Amino acid sequence: MGGPAVESANFLAQAHLHLQQARWPQAHDGFARAVHAMPQSAASHHNLALCQLALGKPEMARQSAERALFLMPSLWQSRMVQGNALKSLGRPEAADDAFAQLLQAQPTNGEATLARADLAINVFGTPLQAVEWVKPLLADPAHAADAQLTILMASVYDRDSSAAELSTAVMAFSKQHLCLPGGLLPPLPPAKLRSRPRVALISPLFCVSPVYFLTIAGWRHVAKGSDIVVFNRGHQLDWATEQFKSLATEWWDVQEMPASALAQRVYQADIDVLYDLGGWMDPVALQALSAKPAREMYKWVGGQSLTTGLDTFDGWIGDEWQSPAASQHLYSEPIVNIPGGYATYTAPHYLPDAPVHKRATPVIFSNPAKLSRGFLAWLAKLPGPKLFVHRQFRFERTREKVVQAVGAANVEFLCPTSHREALEVLGRHEWLIDTFPYSSGLTAREAVAMGMKVKTFTGELFCERHSLHLKAG
């Protein structure tokens, strides 16, 4: 009884339930069925786009979102999905245009403002622009917390406040906004007696990234006597991902899982020791870890710019240069320093040999967000040519930030298309100039491995002291 209309209503209701509970594969199947049954339903195309994006299918998400917009141009949420899909497809300027188009129609749209600010910090290298954009949202209860977090993260790159003031603000933010409600998880049972402890890694960066180059040697050692359980929060898959997979006893893809569900998933995995390798690159995972879903938890490489502000970690893994004992007041986590250095650099097989004769032009090879006002002002006083190397310098607005501060006369930009190409460019030069306040971590180690010299600076935060071990060496 009821016929096709009732049947359609039933599976559509089930699809919405799956969507609300972030059961993405089931929701995807339901809305795909809905789109087939009701091809003129903008809402179904939009919800299908949401699922496709969550499942790491950005091109399909873009197409579905644009179909929804064609059917209902006023459906601004589909413009957001379109922009986020374009970002995932490596088309940030098109993504920015999508968000800007939405803001032309709705100037106070908080989601679009935050999305543009994210691109400003993480792609175009203009954190101060991001701060100016989100400041009005501090008065908007629906978006104030996200705006505050954006300002805090931008301040890591360029700020007027002290390290202590920023760390205190981060701790206050985490206490207010990053802690899941108490009682979400039952008390953890005592650790079981077993020959191989269960060691969990959680990160969106199980790929060609500092997480691979600075931690894989450690995990290869740990895997000899422990079962490695990976909670993968990222969609990028490459040769480094395969290296992590080769060590994993269990591999869980939990990319779009909300914080409470993620905390429960980790809890159910019966983890003895968990290492967070995402940090502020993944605030949702940090929120999940606020519930202490593993018996012991440590913060290590990956978004390890400054304290998480959480009191559930058993330690912050650092070393005497980056997190000296005297800096404990900057951390909510107990500092656990590794003698001789907190990480071991594993070079890729394509690391070029150091040439005998190196070029004198100094190189600035850094995420453009690290090019602070103070650093660029210092650089402007340095005579002679400078070479800026990063794929993000392909964007005019990113280059313009440098040219306005340093001048165009002695500036050259190179935009390598791969990590391998970047290393080949870097290794031809004698000097790498480190940035401040946010310093080079992996890049400085790569430079030294290729026989380069590094001009370093010293700050107080963890991310401001990455290169100090080079001075000691």
Tell where the protein language model's regions lie, with residue ranges.
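Alpha-helical solenoid repeat scaffolds of the TPR/TPR-like class and their adjacent stem/linker regions
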Residues: M1-R359, L376-A377, V402-Q404, R420-E424, ...
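Short donor-sugar binding/catalytic loops of nucleotide-sugar-dependent glycosyltransferases
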Residues: H18, L205-F206, S366-K370, F393
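Short, well-ordered beta-strand segments
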Residues: R198-A200, V363, F388, K455
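Short hydrophobic "strand-cap" motifs at the C-terminus of beta-strands
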Residues: I202, I364-N367, H390, L414
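Glycosyltransferase donor-sugar binding loop
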Residues: F231-Q236, L387-E400
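Active-site donor-binding acidic/aromatic loop of nucleotide-activated sugar
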Residues: D253-Q255, A409-S418, T435-F436
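Short glycine-rich anion-binding loops that position phosphate/pyrophosphate groups of nucleotides
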Residues: G279-M281, P368, Y438-S439
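Catalytic binding pocket for nucleotide-activated donors in carbohydrate/polymer assembly enzymes
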Residues: L426-W431, T435-G473
